[in-house]
Amino acid sequence: MYAKEVTEASKSALLELGLSLKRHHEDMVLAGGWAPYFISREYFPHCGSIDIDLVLKTKILPKYESIRKTIVNLGYVQERQFRFSRIVRSPVDGKDYEIHLDFLCEKEGAKYIDLRKIQEDLHACVFDGLNLAFEFNFEQEVETVLPGNGEDKTKFLVANLLSSLALKGQALNGRAKQKDAYDIFALTHYKGGPKEASENFNKLLKDKNLSVENTKMLKHSLSVIREKFLTENKSGPFAVENFSENRYKRNVVAEQVGIFLDNILLQ
């Protein structure tokens, strides 16, 4: 489980990014581990996130160099084309922690950037289906202490329950990261429990007409999640139990996620 000292440092960096990139508010969506935190925190004691994942709309990729320079000027070190890191002081204990920032974009957007520079990022940061985050999101206020002190606040568009599950399913399919399984488990607590979460998911699904491509992607993500959480002996429940340091037992995790999946309309 991530320590509050580290996640509050990440939230501090998140606030700074939101203020610095405010002009791009409508063209970027917060996804990754912070989205499940903001979605579930009223119903589940989510630990927060260390990494920051921002989905960029394809149309602003021609301006990526300007965005990159803004990030570097904040003190981030560019590790790869879409990945940055920075040492941030935590407002909790005053210690320094390394925070990572990833920009995500669809394959169509990658054409605006020299492909020779993003080979290492292709699977991690460039994939189709990310436009779901722009169809399914909500606005969230972030208020905390900026790096270097001083309270402030800003707003982000945040991937909602449907788009977060879609992207988390994709993540589970491509890597073995315990935090992704934990985030999925957290999302099934939305509105009070798995049945309530599934009702909200179904409502989101009814309110919009998904494209054939996005329907296929969402179905695939949900099938991956089902396979990973099918029984308490599958990797998903093990990952949640391990990440939570045995706070959530495998049988409880498998049952909770199973109830959620059994009650959603899209199969």
What are these model-predicted stretches?
Residues 1-267:
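Compositionally biased terminal segments of proteins
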